[in-house]
């Protein structure tokens, strides 16, 4: 057990500091913005320091763990802890949230509440990724929903209330199944709740009950990932939300579902995962094709990028279902890669739409000359998203490919069919992304309009884009830097999986 509560400080600091926003002097929005950015930077620096000096990469066990009694009557403990599986998403959360705060600079209406909600969301997400207690995991899952709902309903497009209501209905419905699974696993076989991950990992369940638990958790995660057909909230939400909120949704929120699928379903319920894994692979394969095909028909720029996110998450689902070291490492790599790429694409789409006051692709065209910097950055991230070699998207999808090909779970013919369909999806990806670039930046449609909104990207947009582009290139050139974080933990999960 850690003697200094590093993780407690990391989880509590953003929301605690966020409460102070309401007591800042009323001297305009600039004070609130700089205060929030400083809090995010301090949190990111603290995380980096703790993980560099107090985390051992070659140790697959839980590290920096803490255990404090919280509610005695329920035997509920505050149990944070991290391992190789959680350190990547936590660092991604800190990085993307800091940049999303900078991206939210133009927000002026209710600025204090907006930035407090971003910091509250920050704490909820880090708390979830560092939880090693089932009930704490559920509480952090719910804590993160409230700020997202308010961010969606108060800042965004004309249909923001509709999209926010749809989001909360889907996620709250999934949370019911998550709570039932948590309580079922915690109360099984004992008069006292056993909510600790380590205790639950050593618990044996009847196969039928394990399948029931697995299915309940899967529904909750299928909403967040999302898995078709529980994905319809995502395009509407992205289409109406402010682009800084979209960065948090695409960069972090979707990753929570995949993280829970590995952390709870795969690690704690291995027999049920073995039964469900072929269906996960099938769902992921169909999702790649369906979402890519649907994205091609979208005329709303943000919705097209949203469907591309759904398609790319299909590779993560396939990697998790492959039950191989390579496949699971590829799924984790795809999570981090898409976290960067999804956030960058929504940021650039939002800044572009703010400048030209248009959102529909058939109304755009010809803005590459007046906005060359945005054109260059948008094209670069689109190339990374369509898996151009040398960038993170290519490495992640290639590793998932090798994972499913080398899987012992599937026969030769199904593996050939799966890889063939995945290849079709990878062909559709450049079609809808390149056609999107053509509709936005090429042609002559907007040349005759006034150029009052055609100011190219400034230092803020360039800084955010370059900060995201560096890890995209870094992962593409040297993926072992990221894979080294999770490889030992992945081996530990799969060794327990096969020998239990």
UniProtKB/Swiss-Prot annotation:
EC number(s) given by UniProt: 7.1.1.-
Keywords tagged on the record: Chloroplast, Membrane, NAD, NADP, Plastid, Plastoquinone, Quinone, Thylakoid, Translocase, Transmembrane, Transmembrane helix
Enzyme class: translocase
GO CC terms, sorted: chloroplast thylakoid membrane
Provenance organism: Acorus calamus var. americanus
Single GO BP term: ATP synthesis coupled electron transport
Pfam family, one: Proton_antipo_M
Membrane spanning residue stretches: 4-24, 37-57, 87-107, 113-130, 134-154, 167-187, 211-231, 242-262, 272-292, 305-325, 330-350, 386-406, 416-436, 462-482
InterPro entries documented for this protein: NADH_Q_OxRdtase_chain4 (IPR022997), NADH_Q_OxRdtase_chainM/4 (IPR010227), NADH_UbQ_OxRdtase (IPR003918), ND/Mrp_TM (IPR001750)
The protein's name: NAD(P)H-quinone oxidoreductase chain 4, chloroplastic
Location of this chain's protein in the cell: Plastid, Chloroplast thylakoid membrane
Membrane topology: Multi-pass membrane protein
Family annotation (PANTHER family): NAD(P)H-QUINONE OXIDOREDUCTASE CHAIN 4, CHLOROPLASTIC, NADH-UBIQUINONE OXIDOREDUCTASE CHAIN 4
Reaction catalysed by this enzyme: a plastoquinone + NADH + (n+1) H(+)(in) = a plastoquinol + NAD(+) + n H(+)(out); a plastoquinone + NADPH + (n+1) H(+)(in) = a plastoquinol + NADP(+) + n H(+)(out)
Source organism superkingdom: Eukaryota
GO MF, one example: ubiquinone binding
Recorded family membership: Belongs to the complex I subunit 4 family.
């Amino acid at each position: 057990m850690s003697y200094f509560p590093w993780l407690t400080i990391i989880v509590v600091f953003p929301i605690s500091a966020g409460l102070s926003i309401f007591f800042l002097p009323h001297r305009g929005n600039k004070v609130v913005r700089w205060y929030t950015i400083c809090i995010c930077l301090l949190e990111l620096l603290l995380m980096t320091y703790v993980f560099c000096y107090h985390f051992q990469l070659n140790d697959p066990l839980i590290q920096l763990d803490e255990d404090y009694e919280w509610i005695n009557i329920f035997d509920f403990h505050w149990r944070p802890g991290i391992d190789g599986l959680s350190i990547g998403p936590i660092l991604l959360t800190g990085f993307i949230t800091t940049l999303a705060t900078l991206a939210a600079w133009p927000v002026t209406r209710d600025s204090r509440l907006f930035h407090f909600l971003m910091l509250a969301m920050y704490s909820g997400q880090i708390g979830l990724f560092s939880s090693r207690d089932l009930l704490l995991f559920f509480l952090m899952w719910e804590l993160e929903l409230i700020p997202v709902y308010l961010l969606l309903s108060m800042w965004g497009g004309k249909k923001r209330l509709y999209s926010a209501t749809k989001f909360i209905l889907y996620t709250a419905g999934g949370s019911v199944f998550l709570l039932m699974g948590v309580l079922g696993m915690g109360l099984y076989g004992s008069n006292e709740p056993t909510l600790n991950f380590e205790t639950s990992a050593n618990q044996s369940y009847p196969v039928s009950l394990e399948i029931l638990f697995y299915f309940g958790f899967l529904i909750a995660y299928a909403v967040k990932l999302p898995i078709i057909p529980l994905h319809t909230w995502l395009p509407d939400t992205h289409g109406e939300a402010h682009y800084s909120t979209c960065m948090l949704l695409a960069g972090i929120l979707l990753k929570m579902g995949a993280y829970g699928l590995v952390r709870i379903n795969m690690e704690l319920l291995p027999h049920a995962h073995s039964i469900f894994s072929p269906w996960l692979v099938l769902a992921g394969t169909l999702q790649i094709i369906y979402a890519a095909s649907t994205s091609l028909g979208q005329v709303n720029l943000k919705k097209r990028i949203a469907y591309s996110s759904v398609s790319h998450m299909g590779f993560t689902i396939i990697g998790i279902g492959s039950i191989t070291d390579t496949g699971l490492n590829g799924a984790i790599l795809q999570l981090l890669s898409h976290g960067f790429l999804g956030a960058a694409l929504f940021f650039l789409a939002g800044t572009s739409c703010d400048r030209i006051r248009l959102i529909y692709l058939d109304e755009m065209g010809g803005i590459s000359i007046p906005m060359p910097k945005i054109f260059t950055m948008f094209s670069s991230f689109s190339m990374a998203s369509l898996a151009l070699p040398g960038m993170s998207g290519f490495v992640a999808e290639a590793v998932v490919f090798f994972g499913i090909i080398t899987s012992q779970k599937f026969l030769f013919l199904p593996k050939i069919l799966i890889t063939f369909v995945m290849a079709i999806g990878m062909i559709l990806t450049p079609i809808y992304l390149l056609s999107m670039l053509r509709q936005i930046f090429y042609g002559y449609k907007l040349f005759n309009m006034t150029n009052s909104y055609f100011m190219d990207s400034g230092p803020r947009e360039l800084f955010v884009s370059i900060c995201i582009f560096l890890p995209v290139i870094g992962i593409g050139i040297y993926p072992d830097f990221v894979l080294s974080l999770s490889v030992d933990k992945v081996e530990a999960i799969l060794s327990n999986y096969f020998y239990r």
